[in-house]
Amino acid sequence: MEKLSMVTSLLCAITVAVLAVAVVSGEAAVVEHTFVVHEMNATHLCNTTKIYVVNGQFPGPTVDVTEGDTVVVHVINKLPFGLTIHWHGVRQMRSCWADGAGFVTECPIPPGNEHTYRFNVTGQVGTLWWHAHVTCLRATINGAFIVRPRDGKYPFPTPAKDVPIIIGEWWELDLIELDRRMMDGNFDDNPLSATINGKLGDLSNCSRMVEESFILDVKHGESYLLRVINTALFSEYYFRVAGHTFTVVGADGNYLTPFKTDMVTVAPGEAIDVIMVADAPPAHYHMIALANQPPEPDPQIPVFTSRGLVRYAGTTANNNGLPVPMPIMPNQHNTMPSYYFHANLTGLAHPERHRVPMHVDERLFVTLGLGSICRGQNTTCKRRRSPETIVVATMNNVSFAHPKTTALLERYYDGTSKGVYTEDFPIRPPRPFNYTNRDLIPPGPLEEALEPTFKATKLKRFKYNTSVEIIFQSTTLMQSDSNPMHLHGYDVFLLAQGLGNFNAKRDVRKFNYHNPQLRNTVQVPRGGWAAIRFVTDNPGMWYLHCHFEFHIIMGMATAFIVEDGPTPETSLPPPPPEFKRCGNNGLSQP
């Protein structure tokens, strides 16, 4: 946890205390927290930076609940601009109003104001997380959201302890300024280091002052449930502990078939549960979180790494005179371990939850790439790369224009959407092409012919109880990134992933209908595709976006409208009393 400045410390000590109350009612409880969001100063690498935190903590407080509980979080905004809190992965069944997606389900909480989020957590067990959902604030405003089984039983031996491992990034640049620069088309800024639970690690130093490392204390022979969460804005991470192996047992609040590995790959937005047994000779062992990135000709950024420590009870600070073992990490440009890790995971079959829809009502084929538009306009610029153009991210050649003064859900519910959005999000790209041709990465005539792009707020509407299949296809238009796609309000069946261009005749045979993963964030591999299915059983307005922050800001997003079902129990209820409509609420955005 970072140290507070004196003023902020007094503020938090006198006026702000974390309130976490569990009021037992029958089998379920009400778990209540107060989140005070404020600025504070933190010093790393010889520089003091203003950061934005909850209750003086980076990462923020852990929300720890049992399946079936009601969660109540009072958010007090002491920032000079608005923000929302999103409960990443919580299904929010019939509680879309509490999803916390800025300008999608609600307008940001204005400066000096308060807002209460209230929702139930049902049908989910495992690791989720929460984070700010406006601008780049989630880099430091985030925390774990743990859902424990109601009966206290796991489908694996109960661990001695569970520990959140929150992987993030340390930015010296003010996050609000970072957001402004990216909104203006400047993507040259980078974090200075990776972090593990807010610690930069001893590989980072300045003037021979070594940064603090996260330390995991263990006892020989005991097992530990590591809840590995990637909160980073920019990068997917490889995570390894020297001398130890993992058993992957869950992801995104759902159990997985146990999978043994010596390295975890976690994309932005993902939460991976792994069991680590402390079965190595008692000593100290390094853990490493290493960012990966595509090789050239993709744009290159520095290597981000954080190093922590696993420390066995009874061992000495000098590690008994032996060097501390280091894990051997992949080359940062080798993205294949990510593909193999994700493709090898399967869901733990459950007769009630794993009912893959075999009939498909609507199919979408969604390409993910980049394009460019003229500044001040919403269409592709023919002036090539110049100050008059701005690079955007697209889905089927449409870059999402995020609302700035109103919330899409409110307009939909009130029937006042005219002029705010349209419901013609394209279900396929304008024309097929060789989506993974690496000759498209450098800007040029070949890429330019396929690039035509426009910016608009285009949504897709579904009737209640529609069976939907989406093929996400990563492209090499100006870059070849992977794309961690996150759908709010839903768990989706991840039927298959593959490399190259999706081919229906060939690749449908690879679909796993027996025990697919249930995920809220799907890693679409670099130069590849992912196939998902889900049933629209949760009415409301649900944001779909890439979880790379620069892709969100550039427009790789849309929203799905799910209509009400035939009964009150299948319909979105009116907004709760605590919901504040946008209106003239003194909203101040950076």
Swiss-Prot record:
<feature type="binding site">
    <location>
        <position position="547"/>
    </location>
    <ligand>
        <name>Cu cation 2</name>
    </ligand>
</feature>
<keyword id="KW-0325">Glycoprotein</keyword>
<feature type="domain" description="Plastocyanin-like 3">
    <location>
        <begin position="424"/>
        <end position="566"/>
    </location>
</feature>
<keyword id="KW-0439">Lignin degradation</keyword>
<feature type="binding site">
    <location>
        <position position="556"/>
    </location>
    <ligand>
        <name>Cu cation 4</name>
    </ligand>
</feature>
<keyword id="KW-0560">Oxidoreductase</keyword>
<dbReference type="Pfam" id="PF07732">
    <property type="entry name" value="Cu-oxidase_3"/>
</dbReference>
<feature type="glycosylation site" description="N-linked (GlcNAc...) asparagine">
    <location>
        <position position="344"/>
    </location>
</feature>
<feature type="glycosylation site" description="N-linked (GlcNAc...) asparagine">
    <location>
        <position position="434"/>
    </location>
</feature>
<dbReference type="Pfam" id="PF07731">
    <property type="entry name" value="Cu-oxidase_2"/>
</dbReference>
<dbReference type="Pfam" id="PF00394">
    <property type="entry name" value="Cu-oxidase"/>
</dbReference>
<dbReference type="InterPro" id="IPR033138">
    <property type="entry name" value="Cu_oxidase_CS"/>
</dbReference>
<feature type="glycosylation site" description="N-linked (GlcNAc...) asparagine">
    <location>
        <position position="397"/>
    </location>
</feature>
<comment type="similarity">
    <text>Belongs to the multicopper oxidase family.</text>
</comment>
<comment type="function">
    <text>Lignin degradation and detoxification of lignin-derived products.</text>
</comment>
<dbReference type="InterPro" id="IPR034285">
    <property type="entry name" value="CuRO_2_LCC"/>
</dbReference>
<feature type="binding site">
    <location>
        <position position="488"/>
    </location>
    <ligand>
        <name>Cu cation 3</name>
    </ligand>
</feature>
<keyword id="KW-0052">Apoplast</keyword>
<dbReference type="GO" id="GO:0005507">
    <property type="term" value="F:copper ion binding"/>
</dbReference>
<feature type="binding site">
    <location>
        <position position="88"/>
    </location>
    <ligand>
        <name>Cu cation 2</name>
    </ligand>
</feature>
<dbReference type="InterPro" id="IPR001117">
    <property type="entry name" value="Cu-oxidase_2nd"/>
</dbReference>
<feature type="glycosylation site" description="N-linked (GlcNAc...) asparagine">
    <location>
        <position position="41"/>
    </location>
</feature>
<dbReference type="InterPro" id="IPR011707">
    <property type="entry name" value="Cu-oxidase-like_N"/>
</dbReference>
<feature type="binding site">
    <location>
        <position position="131"/>
    </location>
    <ligand>
        <name>Cu cation 2</name>
    </ligand>
</feature>
<feature type="glycosylation site" description="N-linked (GlcNAc...) asparagine">
    <location>
        <position position="378"/>
    </location>
</feature>
<feature type="binding site">
    <location>
        <position position="483"/>
    </location>
    <ligand>
        <name>Cu cation 4</name>
    </ligand>
</feature>
<feature type="glycosylation site" description="N-linked (GlcNAc...) asparagine">
    <location>
        <position position="205"/>
    </location>
</feature>
<feature type="binding site">
    <location>
        <position position="486"/>
    </location>
    <ligand>
        <name>Cu cation 1</name>
    </ligand>
</feature>
<keyword id="KW-0732">Signal</keyword>
<dbReference type="InterPro" id="IPR008972">
    <property type="entry name" value="Cupredoxin"/>
</dbReference>
<feature type="glycosylation site" description="N-linked (GlcNAc...) asparagine">
    <location>
        <position position="465"/>
    </location>
</feature>
<feature type="binding site">
    <location>
        <position position="546"/>
    </location>
    <ligand>
        <name>Cu cation 4</name>
    </ligand>
</feature>
<dbReference type="InterPro" id="IPR034288">
    <property type="entry name" value="CuRO_1_LCC"/>
</dbReference>
<feature type="binding site">
    <location>
        <position position="86"/>
    </location>
    <ligand>
        <name>Cu cation 1</name>
    </ligand>
</feature>
<keyword id="KW-0186">Copper</keyword>
<keyword id="KW-0479">Metal-binding</keyword>
<feature type="binding site">
    <location>
        <position position="133"/>
    </location>
    <ligand>
        <name>Cu cation 3</name>
    </ligand>
</feature>
<dbReference type="InterPro" id="IPR002355">
    <property type="entry name" value="Cu_oxidase_Cu_BS"/>
</dbReference>
<dbReference type="GO" id="GO:0052716">
    <property type="term" value="F:hydroquinone:oxygen oxidoreductase activity"/>
</dbReference>
<feature type="signal peptide">
    <location>
        <begin position="1"/>
        <end position="28"/>
    </location>
</feature>
<keyword id="KW-0677">Repeat</keyword>
<dbReference type="InterPro" id="IPR045087">
    <property type="entry name" value="Cu-oxidase_fam"/>
</dbReference>
